[in-house]
Amino acid sequence: MFTSVKKFFGIHEESDEILYNQLISLLEKLTRVITAKDSDKKEVEKLIDKIKNTNLFNQSDENGNTTLILAADAGLEEACLKLIPKMSDEAINMIENIRGQPALVKAMWRDLDSVCIELIPKMSKENINAIDNCGRTLLMLAAKKGMTTVSKMFINLMPPEMIIHADNEGNTTASYADTDHAFADTTKTIKLLQEKLLKSLASFINKSFLKKDHVKKGVDNFFKIVWATKFYKKIKVNKELLASYLQEQNNDPESTNTPESMIKTMNNFIKLHLFAIAGVCKIIQPAFETSSLHLSCLPKEAICCIISHLENEKWGVDAVLLGEN
């Protein structure tokens, strides 16, 4: 009786469970081969089409693998394209436990451009801006793979600091794009953007820390702290590349500033002042707008940035000791 009722309402839980288990078993097998046979690909696609209870596709196994992660890992483009519209965004963003990668990264390693293009708009900011243990971004991987359309999509979604980010070895996205001359279009796009952003950053640093007229106009330490915090917390750049642009900004013949001394100045400034300021920030609730430069008038985001910097970074020393310096 219950079986007939399920069929009447279009519920296929029992048969779907069996089909789903068959699908998982086949996908796991295909992740262990270099290239799947066409017959196996077709079987996977057939099983996906047969499963009516799409909630099953949102499940993950004990290793955090979803059907989409397994399909992407196996390089099954058509299977991935069938799965994506059947899954929730939350399931699409799931990360497996072994390598800590979502389906998007698996698809990128397998050169599944069309799958990546479908996945990127559904990915969370955290996954888009993820950095691995080697300091590499997804944009770096896309550049290395010569995925021009995918690279441009990342550029449109990423903040500037992620685009000019340097990995643990000091390599930039442009460095990754330049590893294969066949990817000339991707390389050119990224190099031009990197140059533009580094020049902008150099100008920003120069205006924040060198220009005497800014001090005369009343730009005080609180704003300087916010700018410096944003620089150090969010931006990890190749210091050698940045130095050349800083040198262009520093065109005062009487100035003794060097790129290295400028960066050191910012470093020392934050270490000396930021911890004490953060304690004040935590009890301030800015509730009005004014042209005053008082700390209580800083945007809430700026205050959160300062607090977050202290709580997460602490400059490698104990927080109490930092506050005493």
Curated annotation (Swiss-Prot):
ANK repeats lie at residues 63-94, 99-130, 134-164. InterPro entries: Ankyrin_rpt-contain_sf (IPR036770). Keywords: ANK repeat, Repeat. PANTHER family: NO MECHANORECEPTOR POTENTIAL C, ISOFORM D-RELATED, NO MECHANORECEPTOR POTENTIAL C, ISOFORM H. This is Putative ankyrin repeat protein RF_0011. It comes from Rickettsia felis (strain ATCC VR-1525 / URRWXCal2). The lineage of its organism: Bacteria, Pseudomonadati, Pseudomonadota, Alphaproteobacteria, Rickettsiales.
